[in-house]
UniProtKB/Swiss-Prot annotation:
Notes on the domains: Lacks the C-terminal regulatory region which is replaced by HisZ.
Main location: cytoplasm
One annotated Gene Ontology cellular component of this protein: cytoplasm
Name of this protein: ATP phosphoribosyltransferase
Cited function: Catalyzes the condensation of ATP and 5-phosphoribose 1-diphosphate to form N'-(5'-phosphoribosyl)-ATP (PR-ATP). Has a crucial role in the pathway because the rate of histidine biosynthesis seems to be controlled primarily by regulation of HisG enzymatic activity.
Molecular function in Gene Ontology: ATP binding; ATP phosphoribosyltransferase activity
Length: 223
């Protein structure tokens, strides 16, 4: 990307967005009014800075856009970073927002019977196939992954999978669907990510952006 072109900053739709916007504003980047128009179908937005534009995409796509250089920087959960493990992604700042955890959950009835504890093979519904396989490999269990993009909690009750791996915050959704959290794979928080090549070729602008976010987190920790 040419250094004369605007920096492209990718923001995720969903749970992290509301917490990310105040940080972005503190970094001196404010989206145009259309960004906040819920009826708008636009995905690309101008900002108060002519050298920065924002794209709003699915959380999993933030990492892909940045890793492949279509966006220079973005904000995304550490779960997505760990799932894809892109070599071209650099995550210099833990933003201390979007806290949750990636966990294994099972039907309460199976936990009480101990049935899953005896399995050497498990069918698991998740949108995190790589993290799921790695987790179960460590346990000596062969995981057959059923890839879903949502409604994970339905899978056990409909016989699609015996367990699920998904993000958990309060555990309320699990409880309402007859599931219980049985193990935690990793803690999750949102990170600032940048494209490694872009950081080298446009170090002045991207370096300043990284420094701004890093300073905000440091100030928050010191408060």
């Amino acid at each position: 990307m040419s250094t004369a072109a605007p920096l492209v900053f990718a923001l995720p739709k969903g749970r992290i967005l509301d917490e990310a916007l105040p940080l972005l504003e503190k970094a001196g980047i404010v989206p145009e009014a259309e960004f906040f128009d819920k009826s708008s179908r636009a995905l690309s937005f101008a900002t108060n800075r002519p050298d920065v534009k924002i794209i709003r995409v699915r959380a999993f796509d933030v990492a892909t856009f940045v890793a492949h250089g279509a966006a220079h920087a973005g904000i995304v959960g550490s779960d997505v970073i760990d799932e894809f493990d892109y070599a071209d992604l650099y995550a210099p700042v833990d933003l201390d927002i979007g806290h949750c955890r990636l966990s294994v959950a099972e039907p309460v009835s199976m936990v009480e019977s101990g049935a899953n504890a005896r399995e050497s093979h498990a069918r698991v519904a998740t949108k995190y196939p790589n993290l799921t396989r790695r987790h179960f490999e460590k346990l000596g269990v062969q995981a057959e992954v059923v890839k879903l993009n949502g409604a994970m909690e339905l899978a056990p009750s409909l016989g699609l999978a015996s367990r699920i791996v998904d993000l958990v915050s309060t555990g309320r959704t699990l409880k309402e669907n007859g599931l219980v959290e049985t193990s935690r794979i990793l803690p999750v928080s949102a990170r600032l990510i940048v494209n490694r090549a872009a950081l080298k070729t446009d170090s002045a602008r991207l370096g300043a952006l990284v420094d701004a976010f890093r300073a905000m987190v440091a100030a928050k920790d010191a408060a």
